[in-house]
Swiss-Prot record:
Higher taxonomy: Bacteria, Pseudomonadati, Campylobacterota, Epsilonproteobacteria, Campylobacterales
GO molecular function ontology, one term from the record: glutaminyl-tRNA synthase (glutamine-hydrolyzing) activity
Protein keywords: ATP-binding, Ligase, Nucleotide-binding, Protein biosynthesis
Subunit description: Heterotrimer of A, B and C subunits.
A Gene Ontology biological process term: translation
Function comment: Allows the formation of correctly charged Gln-tRNA(Gln) through the transamidation of misacylated Glu-tRNA(Gln) in organisms which lack glutaminyl-tRNA synthetase. The reaction takes place in the presence of glutamine and ATP through an activated gamma-phospho-Glu-tRNA(Gln).
InterPro entries xref list: Amidase, Amidase_CS, Amidase_dom, AS_sf, GatA
Protein name, per record: Glutamyl-tRNA(Gln) amidotransferase subunit A
PROSITE patterns found in the cross-reference section: AMIDASES
Species for this entry: Helicobacter pylori (strain J99 / ATCC 700824)
Amino acid sequence: MITLKQALSLSQDELETLKNEIDAKVRASDLNAYIKAPSLNGASAKGVPILIKDNISVKGWEITCSSKILEGYVAPYHASAIENLHQNGMAGFGLSNMDEFAMGSTTESSCYGITKNPRDKNIVPGGSSGGSAAAVAGGLTVAALGSDTGGSIRQPASYCGCVGLKPTYGRVSRYGVIAYRSSFDQIRPITQNVEDASILFDAISGYDSKDSTSANLKPTHTFINLIRDKRFKIAILRDHINDASNEVQLAYENTIKALKEMGHEVVEKKMLDSHYQISIYYIISMAEASSNLARFDGVRYGRRAQNVKDLKELYLKSRSEGFGDEVKRRIMLGNFVLSSGYYDAYYLKAQQMRLMIKEQYNKIFEEVDLIFTPVAPTTAYLFNYHASPLEMYLSDIYTIGANLSGLPALSLPVAKDPLGLPIGMQFIAKAFDEQSLLDVSYALEQELDLKLD
């Protein structure tokens, strides 16, 4: 597939040809990366076609978060990120499959069915932005937008072998994203390479008065400022990788060696056990989810249950029929930790620990420029692999720290396991220092001669 950098130089006629080629590929593909053929909605404007995750509002498109409860909901406005695409020569073209309401790490919980990994169709593409990552890796789109709440960009990018960038919380407007976890949610790019990630990030970032969490900063210009030969002081967290597979640990050590050979200074640091971060993250995120999803009740928009006697039955039946099992599980757990008897014991304590994690990152960044860790403890696994939801939650063990702290992070494919499955590593940077993330990743990508094949 043509890269985003190349596509931006195409004429309007050439772009129409490209859209037709993408549409034909999607119709012929069995990956189920798209919810439906992109030509059925058409493009949101003229420009380079970008795949959009099904939780980002595009005016006139049915946006469902891959959930039955939002069947028939048509977005009445563009998300700010979509408007920014239009201003930078790009446009939405197609909606990607995802875990229902972004609650999952495998893209198995979508009401539209599973998405397959183009590297091996028997394994998961990751999630929740699995459709976006599978489409990029499978040559079905130039680039894609997803959302990263606890690793939902970086983990599927790692599993599928592409680049996933999570900007600093507040750098990209959340306006127009259907809320799951408001203190975590943000729109992010998934691309074929680091240059494209930089271009797409510059296009969608910027202050937005419609989003109260938007940082009032100048627009970014990371692409024109990409530098290959800059040297950084990088922290590694060896005590964090004990849960990783042998293949991931080997790739981690080999990449550390490559970074040293490139002239970067590598030092060891320690942090709070990542298992604690998992607990903290899920307590807070489930609490926020139960609050945000209370609005979906069958009254104003989306699925409305039929043959009900009263308002209470309408609520119960609409939500029971509309939500999938994983969403129901998280709503119930969220309501539990917010209940009067358990608020202090769980939710309040988790928020206090979240501040402690932020302080730990800040302390490390007083001495280093970047932190380097694996993205996931294993490569992608078979469908229906996890015996329990808890096992699935543990696949986020290395990614959630950046989300809890609101820090920028980038997933880069660095190796393959013996079965040929991609292995991704991530860099984490100081708040609003996406430039350093992109610089070091761009240089490493060139050093390892990484190509999306």
